[in-house]
């Protein structure tokens, strides 16, 4: 049966159901036997295309932002389906941008706190290396084997030393000088102690400068590996008219 009859300027066009289309194709095939081969082929191809298009359109499910896999071409989407695909692609693009931003933030934090030569972790590692290389510290902590000197952060319930946080603060004074202060613990077969560091960085400079770097071992005198205040006092006492303190030359 015919579904719908519409009038056009060129004539009358019938919109047929799939059953009618198949019946029409059968009739057309029978009629085409009386036609020349070329004309019959054209009629058969046209009928099959019309049937395939009608069948495919009736079977295709509606495209939404949740089930769109990009298989249906853009030109075959309805206005609502195009809007849904645009929403899906905008959401996916936003996720990509968010991932890039988060990755960049994590990379920046890793560089500034771990991999940078001026990071807290870098100064912690260099301080431990200097303690292991100092004969005074080795004699009090691990005589004869400096490699057995271990360092860790604040005491916690976690028995894994690497998981203990290092106490460190960074602040600027009213002159714009950055102060990095850090302290951690060292242990050896013979004894244990506390390490303190104070470094400064002048405005416009990239490197920190040691102000104090000491090791306190219980029952022993403090060991200074760096003591800028003592150097300044010695310079004043020796009559040196020019000395350096906090990265600035003083007269």
From Swiss-Prot:
Mitochondrial matrix side stretches: 52-90
Lipid bilayer topology: Single-pass membrane protein
Transit peptide stretch: 1-51
Keyword annotations from UniProtKB, A to Z: Membrane, Mitochondrion, Mitochondrion inner membrane, Protein transport, Transit peptide, Translocation, Transmembrane, Transmembrane helix, Transport
Mitochondrial intermembrane side: 112-251
One GO cellular component term: TIM23 mitochondrial import inner membrane translocase complex
Any one GO BP annotation for this protein: protein import into mitochondrial matrix
Gene3D superfamilies linked: Mitochondrial import inner membrane translocase subunit Tim21
Superkingdom of origin organism: Eukaryota
Family the entry assigns: Belongs to the TIM21 family.
Role: Essential component of the TIM23 complex, a complex that mediates the translocation of transit peptide-containing proteins across the mitochondrial inner membrane. Required to keep the TOM and the TIM23 complexes in close contact. At some point, it is released from the TOM23 complex to allow protein translocation into the mitochondrial matrix.
Quaternary assembly: Component of the TIM23 complex, at least composed of tim23, tim17, tim50 and tim21.
Protein name: Mitochondrial import inner membrane translocase subunit tim21
Organism of provenance: Neurospora crassa (strain ATCC 24698 / 74-OR23-1A / CBS 708.71 / DSM 1257 / FGSC 987)
Top-level taxonomy: Eukaryota, Fungi, Dikarya, Ascomycota, Pezizomycotina
Gene: tim21
């Amino acid at each position: 049966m015919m579904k719908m009859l519409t009038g056009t300027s060129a004539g009358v066009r019938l919109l047929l159901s799939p059953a009618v289309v198949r019946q029409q194709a059968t009739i057309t095939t029978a009629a085409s036997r009386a036609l020349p081969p070329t004309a019959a082929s054209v009629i058969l191809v046209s009928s099959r295309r019309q049937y395939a298009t009608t069948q495919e359109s009736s079977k295709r499910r509606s495209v939404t932002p949740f089930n769109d896999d990009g298989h249906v071409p853009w030109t075959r989407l309805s206005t609502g389906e195009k809007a849904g695909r645009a929403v899906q692609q905008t959401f996916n693009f936003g996720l990509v941008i968010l991932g890039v931003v988060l990755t960049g933030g994590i990379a920046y934090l890793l560089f500034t706190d771990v991999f940078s030569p001026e990071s807290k972790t870098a100064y912690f590692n260099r301080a431990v290396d200097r303690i292991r290389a100092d004969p005074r510290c080795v004699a009090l902590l691990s005589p004869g084997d400096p490699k057995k000197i271990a360092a860790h952060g604040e005491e916690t319930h976690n028995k894994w030393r690497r998981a203990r946080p290092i106490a460190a603060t960074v602040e600027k004074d009213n002159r714009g000088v950055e102060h990095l202060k850090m302290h951690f613990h060292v242990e050896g077969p013979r004894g244990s102690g506390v390490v303190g560091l104070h470094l400064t960085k002048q405005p416009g400079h990239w490197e920190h400068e040691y102000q104090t770097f000491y090791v306190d071992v219980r029952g022993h005198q403090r060991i200074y590996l760096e003591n800028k205040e003592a150097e300044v006092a010695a310079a004043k006492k020796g009559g040196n008219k020019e000395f350096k303190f906090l990265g600035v030359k003083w007269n």
